[in-house]
């Protein structure tokens, strides 16, 4: 039988047209799973896939492409790998990982993918934002010039934080790092600032405790908690801080002010090390991959104070690093110290000595926050850091028991009282005006002749006295953020009167 080529082509053409009529063919780029385990998969056949692209497994689980190799791609699985098998088909989505953003997220506890895990139902929001985005450029930024009031006397007076700054909290475990964060969140009530707390690799019970504390202080309504617990895969712990930053960027680009707390980046680095080793990336120092610095720098560089043209919003980053045996010279702590604009160092020796918050002022620093500090605080706390530094030096010398002159004794007395003034109960942030007034009292020498056990009572009763008898002084400081000569004289008179009454009452 002899075939006519024209007839054959006509028949083929008819068959093709029939397909066009019956169904619209969809071409998908797909590959097959070569290996799966420990939260990662190696996939063959995805030749045209992009770096960081989302891919989908047959059970609906998503993964992010993290390694592009000659014959396969390495994928981190965002969820359980229990139902994924070798030879399963993996499809490209053509999308980069993104999370839902918007006002509807406030007050909720979500996972690293933006899905609610607090049992309060679905989140109503239609906006999404890519978890990875480039940091604002130099022209888009503005110098840090507005303060973030933490409500903690030691921080607001000596290590001030500005909106758009990156300030590291560093210290051993159980030294009060999370307490400093919770105090700061509670103090943002009625300021219009949104707070995002990212829990990386923490116990679920710890996160539940954080939620309970914030609810008790009515702080959840302006807070988002992003939880990647210790039981979550390393991939979700790796993604969580980037998702939280995307949430914060949405508010920042809409002209709002956001503080993002990353608790903590040590566990984040460990999760990334685990992923990198499983993907067979070459290990470097302490077995971390070569791009571990870039992991944190690209995250923290997204924090900024935007220019007025872009709305003037800000994203302040407060990362946490956990040290071992007070050693800040190891790899990850030194990396993050060099990326951030300052650090608050919490010391276990101070914590156990009863100095809480256990801030070591000598090692702590704020490289840009001083420009944002209020004028009132600058005036009263100017000599505070020097007083404490001199006290620490003299206290070490005084242990030898040698005789000291009156000036040295006066410096020791002043230092002891200022340390007592800077102690603070947890979850009780103090307003700017009260901080200014009590630090003024200490630095001007009003407390020098009071016995140490009475300092706490003096402080508490002094606040009540000022609220009842001199509310105009507090109002003046809160409104102008300054302490003019007239207000300073009024404050001086008020402190003098209160002190004489206090000494009579306690027969000092």
UniProtKB/Swiss-Prot annotation:
**Has UniProt tagged this entry with the keyword ATP-binding?**
yes
- EC main group: translocase
Q: Where is the protein found, in the record's own terms?
A: Cell membrane
Q: Could you cite one Gene Ontology molecular function of this protein?
A: proton-transporting ATP synthase activity, rotational mechanism
Main localization (coarse): membrane
Name this polypeptide is given:
ATP synthase subunit alpha
- Site (described: Required for activity): 364
